[in-house]
């Protein structure tokens, strides 16, 4: 059973979360986690001016995802940073190229899930995931979130990302904050949860 993890990351926060999601997927017997990134749309000059060039080198080895890989997967987990309460434009452009999957119904009945990041605690994480879900619904996917059975969801002793809609991390106003142990645990839990649901959906 193949679980595809498709992400866009500018400074590495979503990449780190994607790695944790993959760990969760691999904890389920028979589940294979495959990491893929979507194509970058910003020029090298713009990335350099934003201080993202060095950060992106840490995940440059991850292959760029193709549309066909989505159709071949048993489940897909998407990761994107928040951009004004919505997904990043790079992810939007990638999804806009999946029309043929919609026509063929290649994703109908497959588990789909989303995780995200933002600079601030209330920076649009929930709206980003919920608006992303609309795309999955149009593809006929079965939406899977991060249930409250993940106990870190209810922690009150620290600032942390995470909601029933999906795992998330807070990068801070300068982007210096890295995903916390609790946020990474939520990502692992979500990966495992999606893999378990996908296994049930793919049983004959």
Curated annotation (Swiss-Prot):
One of its GO terms (molecular function) is flavin adenine dinucleotide binding. Belongs to the WrbA family. It catalyses: a quinone + NADH + H(+) = a quinol + NAD(+); a quinone + NADPH + H(+) = a quinol + NADP(+). InterPro entries: Flavodoxin/NO_synth, Flavoprotein-like_sf, Flavoprotein_WrbA-like, FMN_Rdtase-like_dom, NQO. NAD(+) binds at residue 11. Pfam families: FMN_red. FMN binds at residues 9-14, 82-84, 138. Binds 1 FMN per monomer. Residues 3-194 form the Flavodoxin-like domain. It comes from the Bacteria. This is NAD(P)H dehydrogenase (quinone). Its cofactor is FMN. Substrate binds at residue 102. One of its GO terms (cellular component) is membrane. Its EC number is 1.6.5.2. It comes from Syntrophobacter fumaroxidans (strain DSM 10017 / MPOB). Keywords: Flavoprotein, FMN, NAD, NADP, Nucleotide-binding, Oxidoreductase.
């Amino acid at each position: 059973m193949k679980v595809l993890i498709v992400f866009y990351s500018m400074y590495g926060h979503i990449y780190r979360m994607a790695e944790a999601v993959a760990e969760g997927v691999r904890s389920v017997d028979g589940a294979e986690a495959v990491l893929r990134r979507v194509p970058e749309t910003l020029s090298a000059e713009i990335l350099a001016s934003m201080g993202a060039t060095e950060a992106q080198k840490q995940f440059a080895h991850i292959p760029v995802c193709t549309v066909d890989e989505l159709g071949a997967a048993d489940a897909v987990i998407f990761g994107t940073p928040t951009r004004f309460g919505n997904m990043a434009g790079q992810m939007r452009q990638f999804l806009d190229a999946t029309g043929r999957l919609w026509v063929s119904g290649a994703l109908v009945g497959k588990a789909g899930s989303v995780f995200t990041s933002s600079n601030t605690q209330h920076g649009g994480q929930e709206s980003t995931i919920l608006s992303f879900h609309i795309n999955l619904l149009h593809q006929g996917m079965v939406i899977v979130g991060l249930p409250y059975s993940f106990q870190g969801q209810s922690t009150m002793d620290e600032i942390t990302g995470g909601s029933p809609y999906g795992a998330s991390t807070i990068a801070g106003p300068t982007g210096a904050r890295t995903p916390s142990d609790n946020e990474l645990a939520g990502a692992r839990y979500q990966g495992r949860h999606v893999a378990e649901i996908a296994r049930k959906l793919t049983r004959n």
